[in-house]
Amino acid sequence: MGTKHNHELIFMEPVLQKRIWGGSRLKNEWGYDSEQDKELGECWAVSCNEQTDSRVTEGEYRGKHLSQLWREEPELFGREADGTEFPLLIKIIDAKENLSVQVHPDDTYAEEHEHSKGKRECWYILDCPPNAELIVGTHAKDRDELKRMIEEKKWDDLLNRIPVKKGDFIQIDPGTIHAITAGVELLEVQQNSDVTYRIYDYDRLQNGTPRQLQLQQGMDVINVSDEISEESVIHPKSKDNILQRLISTCDYLVWTIRVNGVASVGRIANSFLIGSVLEGSGKCNGQLLSKGMHFIVPHDYSLDRIEGNLRINFAAPVYS
Ligand code: ZN
């Protein structure tokens, strides 16, 4: 089928966000634009919310914002104009220091208490130090033990750590305590929500005062029976030029592909996709791709010919 709209990828302009734990790689290694060169924690690569509204960098929609496309060109996204919010947020995170230990609510809790969507997220590890570990889940047997260990600040005993390597992939469900640790750089695909309950911030100060914790809400939503272990980490092992699905949840699907030569993957979802070029460079149906680019693949667009030497991750929302 295909309408006049659906014949090109729509590239988005990344926006950097300052964070006290951020580094300088987003500017120096990814080439993203910023006036400063430290504490650059997050690249909001494809974003459509009150904080950042991604802008199209080239082509037919150049200069338009994602919110405008979402509202005015629903067919690009394979949907009706139904007043719902853009579903996903794509970030690259550069943690020079540890991020706070945190947890996110699910949709039900967030809608009731925050008038927001909940936050499910997942991580594709782009870089990390040797022997890196992420904090995912806890060792608490039940809610009473969790409460006691938090009150007594027994963080080392409480927090579960999992080893990770470059190229690993991890799903973080709402209710699972988690933290990105110093030195890790990752691609995050998440629900379009910013509701975070901070449990522990290493007693750090920001402008002389500790950042606020949200222990009560955190206790409400922490899932103590989550079974997170080393087996929860996916080690993608696909051959070159073969698309590999990393995860399928009720909110999104994520795939990765390493292209070396030519790959043809066609259409891989019934909605639109968001593509992120994580390594290398090449072309997709003639359009140039290089590391650090993020783009919308319109509904009905077919990824017929991806060529070059590059890795791309794709995310698709699941429409409810
Ligand atoms: Zn999080």
Regions found by a protein language model. Give the residues of each.
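Short beta-strand segments in beta-sandwich/barrel cores
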Residues: 263-264, 279-284
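Ligand-binding loop in jelly-roll beta-barrel domains
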Residues: 85, 93-98, 107, 118, ...
